[in-house]
C-alpha cells in the first residue's frame, strides 16, 4: 500500500473513532481519573472496572480534538480484558511510538497504529497521550 493510501486509511480510522467513539460514557463504582491538557483544552474522564488484576471495562467522556478523543476510544477498546501489567505495557508502547522511540512492534496495536503519524507533530503528542496518561494514573493508583 502506498504511503498516501496508508495515510488516508489512518485518517479515516481516526475520524471514525472521533465521530463514533467506542466506550463513551461513565461507569459507576469504578476507578475514575480526570485529566486535562491546559495547552489546548482537551479534557477526559476515564472510568474503569478493574477486578482480579484485569481491566474488565473502560469508558471515557470528554471534550477535545479528533486526536485526543479518537485515542481515548482506541485505548478503551485495546485495554478491555487485559491484565493491568499488559495494559501498562501497551501504554508504554504507545508512549514510545508517540515519542518516535523504538518500540515492540510484535504486539498488534490494531487501530492504535493509525495514530503513529502524530509523532511528526510535537504539539499534538499531548493530545494523543492524554487518555493513556489517565489509564496509567488509574491503574497505578488502583494497585
Where do the language-model regions lie?
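Structured beta-strand/loop patches that form or line metal/cofactor-binding pockets in enzymes
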Residues: 24-57
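C-terminal binding/interaction regions
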Residues: 1-28, 82-143
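Glycine/charged-rich beta-loop-alpha catalytic/anionic-binding loops adjacent to active sites
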Residues: 49-60, 109-116
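Alpha-helical support elements that line or immediately flank enzyme active sites
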Residues: 71-83
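Secondary-structure capping and boundary motifs in well-ordered enzyme cores
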Residues: 40, 67, 120-124
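Short, thiol/selenol-centered motifs that function as redox-active sites or metal-ligating centers
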Residues: 62-71
